[in-house]
Swiss-Prot record:
Disulfide bonds join 52-65, 59-75, 77-90, 111-124, 118-137, 139-151, 182-195, 189-209, 211-223, 256-269, 263-278, 280-292. Keywords: Disulfide bond, EGF-like domain, Repeat, Signal. Residues 48-91, 107-152, 178-224, 252-293 form the EGF-like domain. The gene is EGF2. PROSITE patterns: EGF_2, EGF_3. Residues 1-17 form the signal peptide. This is Fibropellin-2. The keyword Amino-acid biosynthesis does not apply. It comes from Strongylocentrotus purpuratus (Purple sea urchin). SMART domains: EGF.
């Protein structure tokens, strides 16, 4: 009925455009108002269908009626039941669907606390990171979460990609270590770490706090306890860092051969878990060929300015060339 009235008003408005432009403008405003009211009615109807009542159980005894952010209520269904139509209550899954697929879609990679369904390659633990607490699989080294809530092995391409990501994590570790320096003659690690000499990176030879497990470097050079959320977040980062180590040591990115000079005389070929890799000496770092190269120092500000000017000149010449074309 509302759409018919809108159509009539629109037709009348079109016929009177030439007579009165002001009237046409008013008709357009009225038309927009009626359309907005119709959209609000549709949204209200849709939201009403998705609500349950807080004082009654309309979730078919297979879920809980929970109050949402805006004062509305909705059904949080138990596994493997799902919210269905027309009353948005909890219904069993359709026939012919695999339990594993239902679990993957409804639980979003969750595992069950009383079962071991991480494919034998992880541990099912309660996660508090994010908006909701839930059980998830913490996969072992070399495995990742899959679409079915378990753990699957990384592919070679995934491992190679993670190796590049982990190199940035090494820079993050250098930055964090430089903020947590200490003095050799004092104990200012807040009794939660050890003040040691740094043997790698830009700050090699300086003293830093190596904090105990569960602590982190603070802005005062000591060690402060991590929060639960920080520990869980760093645990996720550590898995990627472990993957990078796996790549460098087990996938020939940094392998060397014992008894040969594969480290360019600037490092030592060491053995770990049956694999060999280069441990570079002071002032050297690993290169893409698996050997050791001198650490490149940052260019001076004058060199940076000259490079910037040359870059601007090249861009200017390129722009002129494109205009001529």
């Amino acid at each position: 009925m509302q759409f018919n009235l809108v159509f009539v008003v629109a037709v009348i408005g079109v016929g009177m455009v030439a007579a009165d432009e002001n009237l046409m403008s008013k008709l357009q405003m009225a038309l927009k108002s009626m359309l907005n009211e119709n959209e609000e009615l549709q949204m209200q109807s849709r939201d009403t269908k998705g609500q349950c009542e807080s004082d009654t159980n309309k979730c078919n005894n297979h879920g809980t009626c929970i109050e949402g952010r805006w004062g509305t209520y909705y059904c949080k269904c138990e596994m493997p039941f799902r919210v269905g139509i027309p009353d948005s209550s909890c219904y069993p899954p359709p026939e012919g669907k695999k339990d594993l697929e239902i679990e993957a879609r409804d639980s979003e990679n969750r595992c069950l606390s009383d079962t071991s369904n991480c494919d034998g390659h992880g541990i099912c633990q309660l996660s508090t990171f994010g908006r909701n607490e839930r059980y998830i699989c913490f996969c072992a080294l070399g495995f990742r979460n899959n679409n079915y809530g378990g753990c699957s092995p990384y592919t070679p391409r995934e491992i190679e990609f993670l190796s590049y990501v982990a190199r940035d994590l090494e820079l993050e570790m250098l930055t964090r270590d430089s903020l947590g320096r200490c003095k050799s003659d004092t104990h200012n690690c807040d009794e939660a770490g050890q003040c040691v000499t740094k043997t790698y990176g830009r700050y090699a030879g300086e003293y830093i706090c190596v904090c105990n497990h569960g602590y982190r470097n603070n802005a005062y050079g000591g060690c402060s306890p991590m929060t639960t959320r920080e520990i869980e977040y760093l645990d996720m980062l550590a898995r990627e860092e472990q993957m990078q180590m796996l790549v460098r040591k087990y996938y020939s990115l940094s392998e060397c051969s014992q008894g040969t000079n594969d480290c360019n005389e600037n490092g030592e070929c060491v053995e770990e878990d049956g694999k060999y890799w280069c441990e570079c000496g002071e002032g050297y770092e690993e290169n893409e060929d698996g050997g050791c190269s001198p650490i490149v120092t940052r260019a001076t500000e004058v060199d940076d300015d000259d490079f910037a000017e040359r870059k601007k000149e090249i861009m200017r010449q390129l722009a002129e060339f494109l205009q001529e074309e």
